[in-house]
Amino acid sequence: MAGPNGDPHVLGGGTGDEGDEGGDTFEEEEYAAINSMLDQINSCLDHLEEKNDHLHICLKELLESNRQTRLEFQQQSKQLNTGADVQGSQPPA
């Protein structure tokens, strides 16, 4: 477990074999807890990466759709302007 400053607790050196075994068990449990937390963080990051990839694809599709719409509006505008120019240059009947 981490201390108040985020530093890992370091057990003081024991004088007997029994203290050392307890320290080893504590370290193993701490490493197992850290590994579990890292696995959870990794899983969350994978999930965020998938969401980011999905959003990136959606935004690219939206951008392409907007480009197509803009081109269509430009073509329609040119056709309307060309039609108005042709009608405007003809003498009234």
From Swiss-Prot:
<feature type="coiled-coil region">
    <location>
        <begin position="59"/>
        <end position="80"/>
    </location>
</feature>
<feature type="region of interest" description="Disordered">
    <location>
        <begin position="1"/>
        <end position="26"/>
    </location>
</feature>
<dbReference type="InterPro" id="IPR005374">
    <property type="entry name" value="BBLN_eukaryota"/>
</dbReference>
<comment type="function">
    <text>Essential for intermediate filament organization in intestinal cells, interacts with intermediate filament and regulates intestinal lumen morphology.</text>
</comment>
<dbReference type="GO" id="GO:0120219">
    <property type="term" value="C:subapical part of cell"/>
</dbReference>
<keyword id="KW-0965">Cell junction</keyword>
<dbReference type="GO" id="GO:0045110">
    <property type="term" value="P:intermediate filament bundle assembly"/>
</dbReference>
<dbReference type="GO" id="GO:0060090">
    <property type="term" value="F:molecular adaptor activity"/>
</dbReference>
<dbReference type="GO" id="GO:0030054">
    <property type="term" value="C:cell junction"/>
</dbReference>
<keyword id="KW-0963">Cytoplasm</keyword>
<keyword id="KW-0175">Coiled coil</keyword>
<feature type="region of interest" description="Disordered">
    <location>
        <begin position="74"/>
        <end position="93"/>
    </location>
</feature>
<dbReference type="Pfam" id="PF03670">
    <property type="entry name" value="UPF0184"/>
</dbReference>
<feature type="compositionally biased region" description="Acidic residues">
    <location>
        <begin position="17"/>
        <end position="26"/>
    </location>
</feature>
<keyword id="KW-0206">Cytoskeleton</keyword>
<dbReference type="GO" id="GO:0005737">
    <property type="term" value="C:cytoplasm"/>
</dbReference>
<dbReference type="GO" id="GO:0070161">
    <property type="term" value="C:anchoring junction"/>
</dbReference>
<comment type="similarity">
    <text>Belongs to the UPF0184 (EST00098) family.</text>
</comment>
<dbReference type="GO" id="GO:0005856">
    <property type="term" value="C:cytoskeleton"/>
</dbReference>
<protein>
    <recommendedName>
        <fullName>Bublin coiled-coil protein</fullName>
    </recommendedName>
</protein>
